[in-house]
UniProtKB/Swiss-Prot annotation:
GO terms for molecular function: mRNA 5'-UTR binding. This is Probable flagellum biosynthesis repressor protein FlbT 2. Signal peptide: none annotated. InterPro entries: Flagellum_FlbT. NCBIfam families: PRK00794.1-1. The gene is flbT2. GO terms for biological process: bacterial-type flagellum organization; mRNA catabolic process; negative regulation of bacterial-type flagellum assembly. Has a post-transcriptional repressor function in flagellum biogenesis. Associates with the 5'-UTR of fljK mRNA and promotes its degradation. It comes from the Bacteria. Belongs to the FlbT family. The keyword Cytoplasm does not apply.
């Protein structure tokens, strides 16, 4: 896999952080866990249940030598999501995500979680619009 990076951009590879000082292309010739700087979510951006799940899996990917705590947190958060979710699309996605995480395919799990962000937003928007307005 070939990755192009801009000057000053960072990439996280197997827990290591690399920053390049000029435009460069990197070819990854074996299986590695990596995350581009633009795909990294800050803790302050984990404002919904799916974004929190993304952040947890991101921690597992960024620190592959110490996933025990993040894995336990993932298990709790994933189970809570499955317990309250009523959307078939969301449930199917959560099952697929769990399989990917179980196989330590964190990057693919992050992609799958990102794909569910619009579904979550639609669900949240629907819930917000169904709340009856009460006059004071």
């Amino acid at each position: 896999m070939k990755i192009s990076l801009r000057a000053g951009e960072r990439i996280y590879i197997n827990g290591a952080v690399l920053r390049v000082d000029r435009k460069v292309s990197v070819e990854l010739v074996n299986d590695v866990m990596f995350l581009l700087e633009g795909q990294i979510m800050q803790a302050s951006d984990a404002t919904t249940a799916m974004r929190q799940l993304y952040f947890i899996v991101q921690l597992m990917l960024m620190n592959p030598t110490d996933v025990r705590d993040a894995s336990a947190l993932y298990g709790q958060h994933h189970a809570a999501l499955v317990a309250v979710c009523e959307s078939r699309e969301m449930l199917d996605g959560l099952v697929a995500i769990d399989e990917l995480v179980g196989a330590t395919r964190y990057f693919e799990a992050l992609k799958r979680i990102r794909a569910l962000f619009p579904v979550e937003q639609a669900i949240l928007a629907g819930v917000a619009t169904d709340i009856p307005f009460e006059a004071a």
